[in-house]
Every structure is written in C-alpha cells, then in structure tokens.
Amino acid sequence: MNNETKFTPKDLDEELVKAKMLERMHDVIETAISKGFSAREALEIMTREIHLIRDEVLLHNKKAHNNIVCRELGVDDSAVIPQRQYLCALMRGSRH
C-alpha cells in the first residue's frame, strides 16, 4: 500500500459553500420567477442539486472509511473483509 490514495472525509456544508450553493439557489429563484415556475418546481431543482453534492460527499466519505480500514488492517482495497472486522477496524482507525 505504498502508493495508496489518501481520502480525507468531507463535510457537506463545506462542499455546499465551495459549490456556491446559496448563489446557485438565488439564481434558481430568479429563473423560477422570470419563467413562471411554481415554488415547488424551484424547490425541487434546488433539492436535486443539493442531493447531487450530498451523494458525492457520501461516496467520497465511504471511500475514506474504506481507506482507513485497509490502512488499519494493513491490506489493500481488494481485500475481502468481514463486516464485524471492518467495523472494528473503522472504529480503531477513526480514533487516530
């Protein structure tokens, strides 16, 4: 695992700030008003875009957790790890 990829968990709020979500929400509202969208349509657009970022953060954090476990167990990411062993290693590794 000398060439392992390091994953640092991400925070959803920080990622929303990086994506300038408040500015994007403002743009969505302006567009909704000018094009006659309903409030529900505008909300659905904003929710969909927030969920895309949330899903990216969740996937990244799952990879980060897997990286922690593999590092803790001294294996690469192709190892087959039983759930109980995975959770124990994750708990130990996340305390470091």
UniProtKB/Swiss-Prot annotation:
GO terms for cellular component: host cell cytoplasm. It comes from the Viruses. Induction: Expressed in the early phase of the viral replicative cycle. Expression of early genes is repressed by viral Repc (latency) and favored by viral Ner protein. It is found in: Host cytoplasm. Keywords: Early protein, Host cytoplasm. Belongs to the mulikevirus gp14 protein family. This is Uncharacterized protein gp14. It comes from Escherichia phage D108 (Bacteriophage D108).
